[in-house]
Amino acid sequence: IDNVVDKDKFENLKALNDAELNVGYLSEVQILKLKKSMKETFNKGLSIKTLASTLISKDIIPHLYTEIDGEKVIKLNQDIRSLIVARTETIRLSGLGALENYKNNGIQKTRWTAAISDRTCPICLELNGRVFIIDSFLTDVEYPAHINCRCALSPVVIE
C-alpha cells in the first residue's frame, strides 16, 4: 500500500477508524456464530436484512454500550449494529470471493472503485481507481476499508 497512499496519512486514518471500532469487537464465540449464520443465509440466498434479523433473533450481536458520567448507555442498538455487521461482512466475503474468481480465471489485477458521494471517506477516496496485483492485495490491503464501506473491486483485464 506504500505506493498508493502516503503511509503516515493512511496510518492516521486507520488509527481513527480502529479506535472507533475497538470497543465493538466480537468475541470468538460470537464470530463462530456469525460465520455459521452467514453460511446458512448465503446458502439459502437470503438478503442482508434477513441475516441481520437472524443475528438479532439468535442474540449473536448485542447492543454496544458506552459509559457516560458513570452510567451505562446504549451507544449502538442491536438492530443497527446487526445490520452494520451483516452488510460489512457480506461485502467483505463478496469481494474476497470475487478476487478468488478473478485469480481462477487468470486475472491478476483488481481495481478499487469507491462509491463517490458526500459520504465517501478519505481512505476510500485515496484508494479509488488504484490498481492492485491480487496476490499482494490479499495480504497488504484491508477490504472493506471500514464498516459500511460501499467500495467494490473489479477485474482489470486491459490497462
Segments predicted by a language model, with ranges:
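Domain-core detector
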Residues: I1-A145, S154-E159
